Amino acid sequence: MKKQFNRMKQLANQTVGRAEKTEVLSEDLLQIERRLDTVRSMCHHSHKRLIACFQGQHGTDAERRHKKLPLTALAQNMQEASAQLEESLLGKMLETCGDAENQLALELSQHEVFVEKEIMDPLYGIAEVEIPNIQKQRKQLARLVLDWDSVRARWNQAHKSSGTNFQGLPSKIDTLKEEMDEAGNKVEQCKDQLAADMYNFMAKEGEYGKFFVTLLEAQADYHRKALAVLEKALPEMRAHQDKWAEKPAFGTPLEEHLKRSGREIALPIEACVMLLLETGMKEEGLFRIGAGASKLKKLKAALDCSTSHLDEFYSDPHAVAGALKSYLRELPEPLMTFSLYEEWTQVASVQDQDKKLQYLWTTCQKLPPQNFVNFRYLIKFLAKLAQTSDVNKMTPSNIAIVLGPNLLWAKQEGTLAEIAAATSVHVVAVIEPIIQHADWFFPGEVEFNVSEAFVPLATPNSNHSSHTGNDSDSGTLERKRPASMAVMEGDLVKKESFGVKLMDFQAHRRGGTLNRKHIAPAFQPPLPPTDGNALAPAGPEPPSQSSRADSSSGGGPVFSSTGILEQGLSPGDSSPPKPKDSVSAAVPAAGRNSNQMTTVPNQAQTGGNSHQLSVSTPHSAAGPSPHTLRRAVKKPAPAPPKPGNLPPGHPGGQSSPGTGTSPKPSARSPSPPQQQQQQQQQQQQQQQQQTPGMRRCSSSLPPIQAPSHPPPQPPTQPRLGEQGPEPGPTPPQTPTPPSTPPLAKQNPSQSETTQLHGTLPRPRPVPKPRNRPSVPPPPHPPGTHTVDGGLTSSVPTASRIVTDTNSRVSESLRSIFPEIHSDLASKEVPGHILLDIDNDTESTAL
């Protein structure tokens, strides 16, 4: 206690008083002492932050730490998900990635254990053991110095007072002297120990710095091992990715898409073309009318994932066309390439048509192989689409306007409107002639179903699956819109599986008197009696496929289960719409109340003999004809007006369109137009001279006034005889331009409408001609032939009233125009009855 009291007294004297303070440490040791606090603080914070960097639990073994790592939990989750997704691409990816994450977690746990053992524990020892020991010795030295100073102060005081008092002082002074020497020795010992520890600490500073080198080396080693795990997993995952072909096609370069999918034609192009070939070829405004945004987005997504379930898009061809345009526009490089942009625009400025076609051909050959094949495929389809321009209104010019900017655009930067404005004019001038002359630019036929992955619809004629008027079972596009007669024509031609055409649905539409007057011709001139020579064709005709089918099945009329007579028709009279005023010479009427009927089937060339089949049915057995019940309400037809402009359906005017799988532009007659007009005028004059006075219609209904405007004419096409010679084979680099080939091939057998015996019917204005279905009329009992070829009787009909059977008119006409009758006799089809329902136009009663 006395020693402690002396220390406090000495400390107070040094602090408050003027007592001398002894400093035993050198300047170097004092500097080392100041650095100890900084080093200790650094080691403490480093240890603390390293613990925060650990993902595992601190202070545990490697296995337990591995289970607690977040990466381990992630790896387990991925592996469980991969087991649920099985063999899908995502399942394989998750499995590989889960294994990699698990391996990374194992490497991380080993790395943390090493860092904790080799780095964190030594840093903790420096901060919490070595430096505190040195600081403890420094405090001990400070206490010893205070004791030494206190003893020395007391010794000095005793030595000063010894001059006045000599009794007892020598012993006290000696005691203080010994105590002072002892305290000095302790100070020296502690000072030496402290200095040694401080110097040792400074000597180990390089060793302490090595801990951080080890930390970085451990991290580098960990990352190397982790990188090895990743490098092992990445190629495997890339292999799975490359093997999986279902990748987005929109916005992907054409070459990459074709290489990845192993296709020749891009999937969106082929899929859209096949869908449009099924239901969109006769859709008006195709590629021009926009589709619904949601429908278009859905179709693009379906094409991106390469789905084969595209049946629902058959009903919306505009969405399909929009998807095709969108794919072409979203290509990083246009189908006609940026590199050839300057050449395309220069060719568009060429005025000479021949040179322009040559330059276009040369530029097409410069396209890359993938672009050339897809461009050829697309142009062939667009040319096929343009063949039905009379229905869909998409001419080559219209197609080039709406689709051209999606095939070629400039590479320079700018707004979409600026690029389109600068490019559209040139593109239209390039695309339009290529579509017009597609067969010359790309000779040969194109198989649109290249991948054979698209199957046509099971019932393509959805509008006509039932002829009873029930459309509830119809599918695809035609169910959503009215059954236009133009579409019916193309679809009915495709129904080759039916041997006959059912006409039950027409029986319900011919009930009213007004309908019969509007459907039937306004008058029927008396037919002259004809002999056998008039009925015989001028020359044998080669049998068609339909006539062979008729002759093989009996060659005569076929009775359906309803008792209605159905006639097999040849291709010549099944497809084209018949003129409204034509009269069949094969079924003239000789009497009104005949009990027998005779049909003359189509003549087939079989060994030069013509076969004729007669079917006789008693009137009582067949039942009364429904047409005889309406005989009393039929009014006499008015006399025909003077012939004016002949309607397009007239035999002397524009001929009917030909038969084909798709509607084609109508072709003119091979004979010159002037000769046809002269023949028409002569026939009309002869008709006015020899036709007796006709009875007029006395119906109570007001007469229908004829329009004052002339009837519209269909677009003209170059005649077959006016086509120039085909270009001969030329070198590929200098092609000879075609002589403007027509859009559709001419069919000589369909270039002229059949001219019938009798007089020319009354001309009347008709609306714009439309393609009508080539379906047979309701059954009419034909007249009976006598032995010499004349007609003896005929069952009267509700649409025509025959009042005369004089044959002098026909004979006089035959004598004046022998070449016309001989030509017509070779073209008329026996056994076929033409009705106004074929054209479905209004009658005009004056």
From Swiss-Prot:
Name of the protein described by the UniProt record: Rho GTPase-activating protein 17
UniProt subunit comment: Component of a complex whose core is composed of ARHGAP17, AMOT, PALS1, PATJ and PARD3/PAR3. Interacts with NHERF1, FNBP1, TRIP10, CAPZA (CAPZA1, CAPZA2 or CAPZA3), CAPZB, CD2AP and SH3KBP1/CIN85.
Positions of region (Disordered): 459-482, 519-807
Localization of this protein: Membrane; Cytoplasm; Cell junction, Tight junction
Highest taxon above the source species: Eukaryota
Every Rho-GAP domain range: 252-442
Domain remark from Swiss-Prot or TrEMBL: The BAR domain mediates the interaction with the coiled coil domain of AMOT, leading to its recruitment to tight junctions.
Motif SH3-binding in this chain: 730-743
Encoding gene per record: Arhgap17
Residues found modified as Phosphoserine: S484, S575, S698, S700, S739
